[in-house]
């Protein structure tokens, strides 16, 4: 199973998991054009995507979702509160609500030959999750936007063959950097983002 970061960071997030013949996306927080270009680099297209799994409703994780779904009616999976927040925050005109499927943490979802399982995380969103993906006895995890971790997350990640985990700041650089104090505290908090050191 390939794990390929099409984009990561505050400007947008989109991860591909699968094989040469298709797979899934985790998040669609960049333009449709950038997603298409990223997939083309791997010899893939949006027609090869079996499902899109959303971690949470922040714009850097969903901004490309509407444009993708208008041209490619791909099933979308997210927690019920996240689905509601997506519909409230983004332009979903001309998109069928039937594409959206509400899921619960620890629920197992089949996407082609892959088993996808969400797990709860701590972040400042309505009901954020990350995902493990299993295929042919191999398990990978995508763990982004976590403010902290606990024994459950350590156990989940410890059962994986590979893990893509986000750590997005050096504490000292953040503290002396140009961000407003409130943003610094948000990033450093338990519902923010892991630092390079804590990761």
Where are these regions (language model features)?
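Conserved beta-strand hairpin/beta-sheet module of binuclear metal-dependent hydrolase folds
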Residues: 1-42, 129-145
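Active-site neighborhood of phospho(di)ester-bond hydrolases with catalytic His/Asp-centered motifs
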Residues: 26-29, 50-57, 76-80, 141-144, ...
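Active-site metal-binding motif and surrounding structural segment of the metallo-beta-lactamase
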Residues: 33-78
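Alpha-helix C-terminal capping/helix-to-coil transition sites in glycosyltransferase folds
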Residues: 48, 111, 158-159
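Metallo-beta-lactamase
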Residues: 80-130, 134-137
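Active-site glycine- and acidic-residue-rich loops that bind
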Residues: 142-154
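Cap/insert and terminal regions of metallo-dependent hydrolase folds
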Residues: 151-199
């Amino acid at each position: 199973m390939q794990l390929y970061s099409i984009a990561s960071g505050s400007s947008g997030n989109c991860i591909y998991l699968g094989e040469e013949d298709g797979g899934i996306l985790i998040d669609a927080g960049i333009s449709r054009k950038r997603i298409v270009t990223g997939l083309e680099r791997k010899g893939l297209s949006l027609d090869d995507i079996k499902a899109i799994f959303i971690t949470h409703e922040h714009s850097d994780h969903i901004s490309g979702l509407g444009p993708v779904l208008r041209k490619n009616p791909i099933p979308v999976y997210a927690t019920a509160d996240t689905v509601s927040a997506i519909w409230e925050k983004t332009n979903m005109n001309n998109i069928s609500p039937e594409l959206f499927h509400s899921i619960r943490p620890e629920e197992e979802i089949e996407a082609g030959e892959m088993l996808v399982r969400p797990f709860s995380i701590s972040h400042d969103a309505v009901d954020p999750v990350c995902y493990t993906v299993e295929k042919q006895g191999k398990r990978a995890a995508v763990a982004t936007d976590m403010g902290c971790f606990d024994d459950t997350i350590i156990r989940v990640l410890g059962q994986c063959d590979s893990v893509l985990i986000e750590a997005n700041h050096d504490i000292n650089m953040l503290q002396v950097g140009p961000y407003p104090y409130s943003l610094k505290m948000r990033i450093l908090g338990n519902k923010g983002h892991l630092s390079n050191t804590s990761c």
